[in-house]
Amino acid sequence: VDREDLEQLVDLSVVCTVSSVDTGLALNAVAENRSTVAEAHIQVDTGLGFGGFLISEPEKILLAYRSLPNVALSGIYTQLHAVTGKSQEVDGQLGQFQQVLEAIHQAGFETGTVHAAGSFALMHFDDARLDAVRAGSAILGRCRRTKGDGLTTVGYGEASITEVRWLPKGHTVGADKLIAMKKPTRVAVLPVGYQNGFGVERPRSQSLLELWRAWRRSRNRTVRLNGQRVRVIGSIGASETILNV
């Protein structure tokens, strides 16, 4: 753990994560040196593997509650992982997490705010909505989805064309894979690209069928121009897209 980063987090009163005894001790030392108390949540690993106390080592979690006088442990969380949206995928993880919570309570400590659901779990598993949820990719509009999830389009983006011109037969366009014009073509430049989120999507699953469908959609992408659908030519660039007008 970088001490300078911890010092800045403590100075800004950021709610930190304690994912191990070592990170807890490091945060406690910084807070003690500044004569303050840092706020943090305990992270528990129920199988995702990104970090946190292992569920098989509850004694280490209890050590964090007992040994960090300058850290106020105001919450505890895990990150549920699921693929299909079926409840049995997360039932076991929630059960393991609940066992950790019970061990903490039996030792006489309060868990504070308990949370386990990211965006996918938030939308698919009612039991995962505990004291709080962490809606990240759902807010960005790029959350992994399942069929029949009830989500509907709530808006659209608008941009002005920056240039219209003719390209001769044989001229190429595209950011990644060049496409040659088969005939003289009138094109327009749209000042929007993948850095704006255009064309960025997550398949509903990683199955070959869903990946193939996503590939087909990318080859037939359109935008609406003056009430008419026009096709995108070539791959979408970082900040520009070419339209066939």
Q: What annotation goes with each model-predicted range?
A:
Residues 1-116, 129:
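Active-site-proximal beta-alpha core segment in soluble small-molecule metabolic enzymes
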Residues 20-22, 92-245:
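Active-site anion/phosphate-binding pocket segments in diverse small-molecule metabolic enzymes
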